[in-house]
Structure formats: C-alpha cells, structure tokens
C-alpha cells in the first residue's frame, strides 16, 4: 500500500502549523545525531511509523517504509518486489490515468525481464470500466499499479473493486 498526498494536494491548516513549528523550533535529521533535538525528531518519526503500522494492521512497524514521494516509492517496488517476483510471462496492469511515475518504472522492468504491461482504458471522463479491467486481468497478472485519485485527470478510481479483483486473481 502506498499513500501519497504530498505532491499536489492542499494541506490542512493543522498540518501547515505543525510543519511550521517543527521547522522553526524542533527540526533535526532523523537517526543522524545523538543530541536532544535529533533524538526527539527520531522518536517522533518512529512514533509516526508505529501509528501507520497500526492503522494498516501491519504485523511489524518495520514493514512501513517512508520515502520522499511517489516516484521513489514506485521505483523501489519495481526494482525490488517486481524484479524478484516477476518473470518473462508475467503481466503488470496499469491504467491510462497514470502519471509517468507509475509508467516508466514498469517499462524499465519490462525491458529488464521481459514481462508484459497491459493498460486499462479510461472513458471520456477519465474513469475506468470494471468490465474492461476484468477482461485484461489474468492469472499471469502479478502487479496491478494504479492511482486512487488521478492528479493527471482528476478522477477517482474504484480502488476497493479493483483491489478485490486483483487479489482474487493472485495479483498485488
């Protein structure tokens, strides 16, 4: 699961105020110092990891990895999980609503291992058809990579339905 709202969405006032306070009075590198502020920042960072782990029902806090953004996260998944778990006969499904950060890593993986990329079409409003998705997914599909809310088209994709179908077919 990857969650990202930092790239192009508005921030709640309390988030802006909290960040302002941190930058003005508490900022220090995480896990990079032995001084008080660094220890406090590191503790808050790990506290956030624990809260996310609990929210997502992760077995261990260490299952939660923070990255700088979407591009880094998708590249990490493609170059680690993708490279280890996909082969020449496997498929990746994406949609036409995707940002380049969710296209190029899969294209690079395809060049490296020979897997296939299938693209779910979108209608004139930028929505995907569940029927079209179901026609494209198969037991060869190992990864379904799509945005929940497209910052390219502004559409909301049916994440629960797509995830259920993906899991039913053995894909992540």
What residues fall within each predicted segment?
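Pyridoxal 5′-phosphate
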Residues: 1-172
């Amino acid at each position: 699961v990857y969650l990202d709202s930092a790239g192009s969405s508005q921030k709640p006032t309390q988030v802006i105020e909290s960040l302002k306070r941190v930058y003005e009075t508490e900022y220090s590198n995480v896990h990079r110092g032995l001084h008080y502020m660094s220890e406090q920042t590191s503790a808050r960072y790990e506290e956030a990891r624990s809260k996310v782990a609990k929210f997502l029902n992760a077995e261990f806090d260490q299952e939660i990895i923070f990255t700088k953004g979407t591009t880094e996260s998708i590249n990490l998944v493609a170059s680690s999980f993708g490279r280890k778990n996909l082969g020449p006969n496997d498929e990746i499904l994406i949609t036409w609503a995707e940002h380049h950060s969710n296209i190029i890593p899969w294209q690079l993986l395809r060049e490296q291992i020979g897997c296939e990329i299938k693209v779910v079409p979108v209608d004139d409003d930028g929505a995907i058809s569940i029927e079209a998705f179901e026609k494209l997914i198969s037991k060869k599909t190992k990864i379904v990579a799509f945005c929940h809310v497209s910052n390219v088209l502004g559409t909301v994709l049916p994440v629960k339905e797509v995830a259920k179908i993906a899991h039913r077919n053995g894909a992540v």
